[in-house]
């Protein structure tokens, strides 16, 4: 028992000296002398313990109740973190806490010797000095953008390339090499903008945009290269196709990409396909079809069923490639001369009723609604419903519609009949009043 007590006193002395040295060190760094009295109190407590002796229970209680104890000049919390004296912020490291305290005190010790810039953080001064030296160590992997700060690079990736930070493991070096090879293959294909490749598996697969079906008959190679797989497009055959590793850019950027690629195609490829020529063997169009609204389809089918007389030579065929019509157009000639109604939409494809097989040359075409009539009388009646200045304004009641679908639904709802009955009733009342 007599040998253990001096060892305990030596340990307490060393601990008190360590606390004193750390306190003076912190005071020299922060420039504050407010904790001198606390250090003297700790030293006085140490001398008293040397003179009067120190029993073990007092030391154990002071270490257990260390929530309010000053260590290194700062107050510690119950979990051992250093607590800020101005707010509830706590940190494990002293340097991080000192930087935080400078927010309250307004101290900015890190100053630029070339301009009046000053900051409380050393890393901010390092980033500022790069503006004087012109150094830009952070480079974007998708383009030639370079910057001097990491936060600017993250903002550039989110704003320019629509890349969101994904939680998970970082891609390995092999994935980075594979990504670089894919980017070279894509750039060799002549894209104006590079396709984004997500090295970590995304949460969902991006579906093919619907409006790209307008270019299905003109650029079949782009469809297979951009949407089936980039590895299949590259003739090396080194990379395997994995649909989860490909992330298509947003629709607007992809549309501009296809438009630029279309402008760079040869003249013979840009010409629209004639109805006599069949589809290319490599063409794999992803046209999504949907039946028209029930009311509109019934009205149009009735008009076509009632028409039996041949069309006059005034009918002019227009071989446009829009697939957003409630009635089928000559775009379906490439598949067996059988016209089917098709609407490019994001809904899954469903079978649609087929119209009687008839030569599109004999059909009358409404360019506003993209509808075809086999009878000249029905065509004339339909064209009389369009306004002169605004084709989507009803010529009967004057109702202005947004597009051809709203225009067709306007007649399907019978709004014109109700308006005509009201007008006739008003004219009758006026006649009776007179």
Curated annotation (Swiss-Prot):
Cellular compartments annotated: Nucleus
Keyword Transcription regulation included in the entry's annotation: yes
Start-end of Polar residues biased regions: 260-274, 337-349
Segments of skewed composition (Low complexity): 296-313
Gene3D superfamilies cross-referenced by the UniProt entry: Classic Zinc Finger
UniProt miscellaneous comment: 'Pegasus' was the winged horse in Greek mythology.
Family as reported in the entry's similarity comment: Belongs to the Ikaros C2H2-type zinc-finger protein family.
Identification of the protein by name: Zinc finger protein Pegasus
């Amino acid at each position: 028992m007599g040998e253990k007590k001096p060892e305990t006193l030596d340990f307490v002395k060393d601990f008190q000296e360590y606390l004193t040295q750390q306190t003076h060190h912190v005071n020299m760094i922060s420039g504050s002398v407010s904790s001198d009295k606390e250090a003297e109190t700790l030293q006085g407590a140490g001398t008293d313990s040397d003179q009067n002796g120190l029993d073990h229970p007092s030391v154990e209680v002071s270490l257990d109740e260390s929530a309010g104890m000053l260590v290194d000049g700062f107050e510690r919390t119950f979990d051992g973190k250093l607590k800020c004296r101005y707010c509830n912020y706590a940190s494990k490291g002293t340097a991080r806490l000192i930087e935080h305290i400078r927010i309250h005190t307004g101290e900015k010790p890190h100053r630029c010797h070339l301009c009046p810039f000053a900051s409380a953080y050393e890393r901010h001064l390092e980033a500022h000095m790069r503006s004087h030296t012109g150094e830009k160590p952070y480079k974007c992997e998708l383009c030639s953008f370079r910057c001097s700060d990491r936060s600017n690079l993250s903002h550039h990736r989110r704003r320019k390339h629509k890349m969101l930070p994904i939680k998970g493991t970082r891609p390995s070096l092999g994935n980075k090499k594979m990504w670089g090879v894919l980017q070279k293959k894509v750039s060799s294909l002549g894209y104006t903008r590079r396709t984004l490749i997500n090295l970590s598996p995304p949460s969902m697969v991006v579906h093919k945009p619907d409006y790209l079906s307008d270019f299905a008959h003109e650029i079949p190679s782009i469809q297979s290269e951009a949407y089936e797989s980039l590895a299949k497009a590259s003739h090396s055959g080194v990379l395997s196709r994995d649909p989860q590793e490909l992330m298509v850019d947003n629709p607007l950027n992809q549309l501009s990409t296809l438009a630029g690629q279309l402008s760079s195609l040869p003249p013979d490829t840009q010409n629209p396909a004639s109805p006599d020529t069949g589809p290319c063997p490599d063409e794999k169009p992803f046209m999504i079809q949907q039946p028209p609204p029930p009311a509109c389809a019934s009205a149009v089918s009735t008009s076509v069923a009632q028409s039996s007389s041949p069309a006059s030579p005034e009918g002019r065929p227009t071989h446009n490639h829009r697939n957003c019509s409630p009635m089928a157009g000559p775009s379906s000639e490439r598949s067996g001369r059988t016209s089917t109604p098709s609407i490019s939409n994001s809904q899954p494809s469903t079978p649609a009723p087929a119209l009687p097989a008839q030569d599109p040359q004999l059909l009358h075409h409404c360019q506003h609604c993209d509808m075809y009539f086999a009878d000249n009388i029905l065509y004339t009646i339909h064209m009389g419903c369009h306004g002169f200045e605004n084709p989507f304004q009803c010529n009967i009641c004057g109702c202005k519609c947004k597009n051809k679908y709203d225009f067709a639904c306007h007649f399907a709802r019978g709004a014109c009949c109700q308006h005509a009955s009201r007008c006739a009733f008003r004219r009758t009342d006026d006649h009776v009043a007179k």
